[in-house]
């Protein structure tokens, strides 16, 4: 890669750590990842080595860019909502390799291409990939912005986990 090409790369390719907030804030708890990015920006100091992005439902294009780039972060954390039958507001870490094939259709990382791209980045590109997800309550059938009380209450502890794991400046 030429020096000019490297300069033209977006920050999300060049920073050592990339944190992606995924979801649709127009559909209730599905906006957890985006709301968590906003909470982190307002309540924590984001280190220079971390690129923190609210990517909404546009995560696939960004992941394709990373897969095709010769320069990429060493680690990626995806923040998202999911429904795996737990209590609304429960936050859990999911290993992308452990998403059961039967659950790929249900997994809310905005569907199969995203899950496959995360595995591609991990297995073939050497990127450490982690997923922090929050169990949603029932999602609305029509546009209804805002998190439920249970999911909103999960923001501070989830943000503390992210800060502890990714904002350390040893």
Residue ranges and their predicted role:
Residues 22-26, 103-106, 144-146:
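A short glycine/serine-rich beta->alpha loop
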Residues 20-22, 132:
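Short hydrophobic segments within beta-strands
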């Amino acid at each position: 890669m030429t020096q000019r090409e490297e300069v033209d790369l977006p920050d999300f390719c060049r920073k050592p750590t990339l944190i992606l907030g995924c979801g649709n804030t127009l559909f209730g708890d599905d906006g957890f990842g985006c709301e968590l990015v906003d909470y982190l920006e307002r309540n924590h100091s984001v280190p220079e080595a971390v690129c923190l992005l609210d990517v909404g439902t546009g995560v696939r294009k960004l992941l394709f860019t990373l897969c095709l780039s010769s320069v990429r972060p060493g680690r990626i954390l995806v923040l998202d909502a999911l429904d795996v039958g737990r209590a609304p507001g429960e936050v859990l870490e999911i290993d992308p390799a452990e998403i059961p094939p039967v659950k790929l259709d249900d997994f809310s990382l905005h569907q199969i291409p995203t899950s496959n791209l995360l595995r591609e980045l991990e297995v073939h590109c050497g990127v450490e990939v982690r997923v922090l997800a929050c169990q949603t309550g029932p999602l609305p059938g029509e546009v209804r912005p805002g998190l439920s009380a249970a999911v909103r209450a999960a923001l501070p502890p989830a943000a503390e986990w992210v800060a502890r794991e990714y904002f350390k400046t040893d």
